[in-house]
């Protein structure tokens, strides 16, 4: 136990090993012998299969939820139950039904639902601490920008069986979209805007609700895929006239963003059909983005874009 400030109360620090034990033994139900027989790498992979990120990541998140200065994210002492916290992370990773959660965690549907959303909302609120727009930029080329579409249940429309505002051209189904921006030179998500209906393409979102005006105001530029063509003052896209070095730079930058998108889609709540409300989608998407930001900070840094000889 570690004593924090008076406002934060007594902080319950858990090591990655303790987090893993709670997850595998007390929640998932692995026997002590099975855990001991396996290598640490195997147990970490088991844990990630149920909770989405490693014990080291969740140990850091758990500590920050108690120490953060973000009031909306701070968990008061009476609510600091690591089992409930991991139950919420399991919801993000495996997206179980309430019946499945009730059986797995031996908790009533009502209490399971309440504690899941409580901790998901707390992790989501850490975005104010983890998803940060820098005060200044070191280079005019600052970030990549991309829209991430997720499949959601079909929204009711008063006339048609399908609402065209929600139609995702990526999935051919109803969807919601977030605009994400990632620093070109750091493992850092710098902006997360949404959710938007997927009827509007990424380019339209960018100029009407997204980052374009902020980029212009700061005098910086982004790199985007071909869907952002036509906004040369704020975003650069792949161009047949690019030199070999510039072409490689843009390609690696976009693949780097795809790497982060892939981390997020590793969570079943975002990779399959989302069956809850739009508000709950916002909770889940932003919480997962925060968790993935911890991942790239702690153990999975995004690769460097610039390689030797790129601009020779």
Task: Briefly describe each language-model feature range.
Residues 90-91:
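Short helix-to-turn junction characteristic of helix-turn-helix DNA-binding domains
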Residues 1, 5, 79-84, 95-312:
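Short, well-ordered secondary-structure "scaffold" segments embedded in the functional core
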Residues 1-76:
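Charged, often Cys/His-bearing segments associated with DNA-binding zinc-finger transcription factors
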């Amino acid at each position: 136990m570690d004593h924090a400030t008076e406002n934060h109360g007594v902080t319950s620090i858990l090591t990655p090993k303790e987090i893993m034990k709670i997850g595998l033994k007390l929640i998932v139900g692995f026997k002590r012998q099975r855990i001991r027989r396996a290598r640490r790498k195997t147990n970490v992979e088991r844990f990630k299969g149920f909770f989405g990120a490693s014990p080291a990541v969740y140990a850091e998140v758990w500590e920050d939820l108690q120490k953060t200065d973000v009031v909306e994210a701070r968990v008061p002492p009476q609510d600091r139950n690591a089992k409930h916290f991991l139950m919420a992370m399991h919801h993000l990773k495996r997206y179980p039904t309430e019946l499945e959660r009730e059986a797995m965690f031996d908790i009533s549907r009502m209490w399971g639902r309440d504690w899941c959303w409580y901790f998901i909302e707390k992790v989501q609120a850490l975005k104010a601490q983890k998803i940060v727009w820098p005060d200044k930029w070191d280079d005019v080329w600052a970030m990549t920008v991309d829209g991430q579409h997720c499949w959601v249940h079909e929204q009711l429309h008063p006339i048609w069986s399908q609402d065209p505002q929600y139609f995702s051209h990526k999935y051919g189904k109803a969807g919601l979209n977030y605009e994400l921006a990632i620093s070109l030179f750091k493992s850092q998500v710098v902006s997360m805007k949404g959710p938007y209906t997927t009827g509007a393409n990424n380019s339209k979102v960018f100029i009407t609700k997204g980052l374009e005006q902020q980029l212009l105001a700061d005098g910086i530029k982004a790199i985007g895929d071909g869907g952002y063509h036509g906004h040369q003052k704020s975003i650069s896209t792949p161009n047949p006239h690019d030199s070999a070095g510039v072409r490689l730079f843009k390609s690696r930058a976009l693949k780097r963003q795809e790497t982060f998108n892939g981390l997020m889609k590793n969570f079943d709540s975002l990779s399959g059909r989302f069956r809850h409300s739009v508000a709950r989608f916002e909770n889940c998407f932003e919480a997962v983005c925060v968790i993935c930001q911890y991942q790239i900070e702690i153990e999975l840094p995004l690769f460097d874009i610039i390689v030797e000889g790129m601009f020779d």
